[in-house]
Amino acid sequence: MYTMQSWSCIFLIICSMQSVCHCCDWIRHHYGHLSAEYLSLLDQMGGDITKQNAPVLFPTSLYRHIDDAEFEDKVIFLKETIYQITKLFDGNMKSVTWDKKNLDDFLNILERQLENLNSCVSPAMKPERRLKRYFKKLNSKVLRKMNYSAQAWELIRKEIKRHLQRLDILAAQMY
């Protein structure tokens, strides 16, 4: 009886280690490449990045905090940030003057990153609430308050670029 339980326990440990290792390998070998692609597309899809600042402060303290976190917490943070970014782009984009193909490619790569990161973490793991609140503020104080104008979307593009650059650094530090 105990032998069967021991073997079951060992099997579960090995399976979970393989999942983490697979995730490790994916982050090490693919995350940076896809990140470079979507950062390039983000630059190409519009003109110069606006000099104007968003009325919502960038969550620098969250990034500092996650720098010292465990591997799995970092993966959850990567996943949740990309998820929140994709949610922002579900809004009213009628006034956007960006290159449509580059925008579609950008969003497709983000979705691909999200799928891979989703396979790395348990659905039961909870994301950082402060991160969710930050993106809700970004949505309400920039997009909604500015009526989803082209100027509002340019501010969002600028903020998203900062996030994606910071996520790229975080992922590079994970291995």
From Swiss-Prot:
A single Gene Ontology CC annotation of this entry is:
cytosol
> Which superkingdom does the taxonomy of this entry point to?
Eukaryota
Kindly list the cysteine pairs connected by disulfide bridges. 24-120
GO biological process terms, semicolon-separated: defense response to virus; positive regulation of gene expression; positive regulation of protein phosphorylation; type I interferon-mediated signaling pathway
Give the record's keywords alphabetically. Answer: Antiviral defense, Cytokine, Cytoplasm, Disulfide bond, Secreted, Signal
This entry's comment on induction and repression of expression is: In the RTG-2 fibroblastic cell line, isoform 1 is highly induced by polyinosine-polycytidylic acid (poly(I:C)), a synthetic analog of dsRNA, that binds TLR3. Isoforms 2 and 3 are also up-regulated by poly(I:C), but to a lesser extent. In vivo, all 3 isoforms are induced by poly(I:C) (in anterior kidney leukocytes) and by viral infection, such as that of viral hemorrhagic septicemia virus (VHSV) (isoform 1>isoform 3>>isoform 2) and infectious hematopoietic necrosis virus (IHNV). However, induction kinetics is isoform-specific.
Pfam hit, one: Interferon
- Miscellaneous note of the record: Salmonid type I IFNs are classified into 2 groups with 2 (group I) or 4 (group II) cysteines in the mature peptide. These groups can be further divided into 3 subgroups (group I IFN1-a, IFN1-d and IFN1-e and group II IFN1-b, IFN1-c and IFN1-f). Each subgroup can be represented by several genes (up to at least 7 for IFN1-e).
The family line of this record is: Belongs to the alpha/beta interferon family.
Listed PANTHER family: INTERFERON BETA, TYPE I INTERFERON
Q: What does this protein do?
A: Key player in antiviral response. Induces expression of TLRs, including that of TLR3, TLR9 and TLR8a1, and that of cytosolic pattern recognition receptors, including RIGI, IFIH1/MDA5 and DHX58/LGP2. Also induces MX1 and its own expression. In the presence of intracellular IFNAR2 (iIFNAR2) and IFNAR1B, intracellular isoform 3 may mediate STAT1 and STAT2 phosphorylation and induction of EIF2AK2, MX1 and RSAD2.
Q: What is this protein called?
A: Interferon a3
Q: Which gene encodes it?
A: ifna3
